[in-house]
A protein has these predicted regions:
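Two-component/phosphorelay signaling modules centered on CheY-like receiver
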Residues: 12-35
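C-terminal output helix
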Residues: 94, 112-122
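Alpha4 helix (beta4-alpha4-beta5 surface) of REC/receiver domains from two-component response regulators
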Residues: 70, 91-108
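Acidic, metal-coordinating helix/loop segments flanking the phosphotransfer/catalytic sites
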Residues: 19, 35-56, 77
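Conserved phosphotransfer cores of two-component systems
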Residues: 25-26, 47-52, 74-81, 102
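Receiver (REC) domain active-site loop signature in two-component systems and cognate sites
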Residues: 63
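Active-site T/S-Asp motif of two-component receiver
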Residues: 58-60
Length: 129
């Protein structure tokens, strides 16, 4: 089964980094990668539908406009079943606490450990089966 991953980050180089790090898994059909540059754009993509439908969202916290914690709150209102992993360069206790309180599945600090992230994604996918 292919899992769609929606990566939400306002930094354009993040999309390229994720494309590089997940190149093999995308080629093998394990993951389908989707990208949004803002919280608002992520909500539009979710409303329009993302295929395949099993989705994991990876969102930066610090973004202009709707930040990642606001996005997390909106996603949990609209699609509470979707796992959302927060990714941030700021791993302070307050952000970690808020992310957990708002329903984040994971809290990941940058630079991203992609081996660990892939393990966490596999675990989420296995739990959904």
């Amino acid at each position: 089964m292919t899992v769609s991953i929606l990566v939400v980050d306002d930094e354009t180089d993040v999309a390229e980094l994720f494309r590089q790090r997940f190149r093999r898994e995308v080629r093998q059909g394990t993951y389908a990668m989707h990208f949004a540059a803002s919280g608002e754009q992520a909500l539009e993509k979710l409303a329009d539908g993302i295929e395949p439908t099993l989705i994991v969202i990876l969102s930066d916290i610090n973004m202009p406009g709707m930040d990642g914690l606001q996005l997390l709150t909106e996603i949990k209102k609209r699609r509470p079943e979707l796992p959302v992993m927060m990714v941030t360069a700021y791993g302070d206790d307050e952000r970690r606490r808020l992310a957990g309180e708002y329903g984040a599945a994971e809290f990941i600090t940058k630079p991203v450990n992609f081996d660990l992230l892939k393990t966490q994604l596999r675990d989420l996918s296995d739990a959904a089966d």
